[in-house]
Amino acid sequence: METITITTEFIKLQDLLKFANLVSTGGEAKQLILDGQVTVNGEECLMRGKKIRPGDVVAFDGGEYTVAYED
């Protein structure tokens, strides 16, 4: 499992996918989320604006990513 480190209290799911270079565009992230291809903490998430916080686990395209905070 890879770790994605953020420097804010939370990051929106769509922004996290772009920030971690898992997708190349926001439009691609939006479509993948709406198609149900992304899970958050083991549950399908269709909300691209969902707040992802440190400790959350995002799974996409066979990979799992945990979110950590660093200031």
Where are these regions (language model features)?
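Short, Lys/Arg- and Gly-enriched loop/turn segments at beta-strand edges
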Residues: E64-D71
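A detector for short, charged/polar N-terminal pre-domain segments
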Residues: M1-I11, V67
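A basic, amphipathic helix-loop patch mediating RNA/tRNA/ribosome contacts
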Residues: E9-K51
